[in-house]
Amino acid sequence: MLTVLLASRNAGKLREFEDLLPGMTLVSWPAEAPELPETGAFFQDNALQKAEGARAWWLAHGTESVDAVLADDSGLCVDALWGGPGVLSARFAQDLSSYAERNRRLLDLLPTDATRTARFVCVLAWAPLLDTAGERFTVSGAVEGSLALEHRGSQGFGYDPIFLPEGFDQTFGELPAAVKHTLSHRARACAALRAKLGE
């Protein structure tokens, strides 16, 4: 079984990755480690930045053995907001303390007659800890859908309670995790990762 450093402190992401990658032992990014850079214009750029930053820090300071680093950059892309918040999803409305408040602000940005189509995108970057242990690569997943009129449900995290996946009348915040994990952007990216690794 591979031991993998997850380059994130996001508890929601860690829970999802534990469900979606049961063949791996995940080590979360430690509290004493620095924030990882996210200065790219695209999800792939940010995922690679985080993977390389985490790999370099772990080689110098890591306290346990890991085989590889896994970094995620993901976000919500709303057509009526020209693809926003996109790569800025994690930093959107940071002056507000709760996901519910941030979701309300996002919904308030939409004109009443705007199209509500949106998609969740996830890019994963894989970096073996040692250069001799294989290639670095990225995989991605996306799920199409639309924005609900209001915050609905308490499952998941982030924008889940306002996102209606295509073909469903429940948000990710209302759907059971077992259902979400069959169709979410992160589930699809993890499936691509497992395929690439030959699992």
Regions found by a protein language model. Give the residues of each.
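Anionic-ligand binding patches
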Residues: 2-5, 9-199
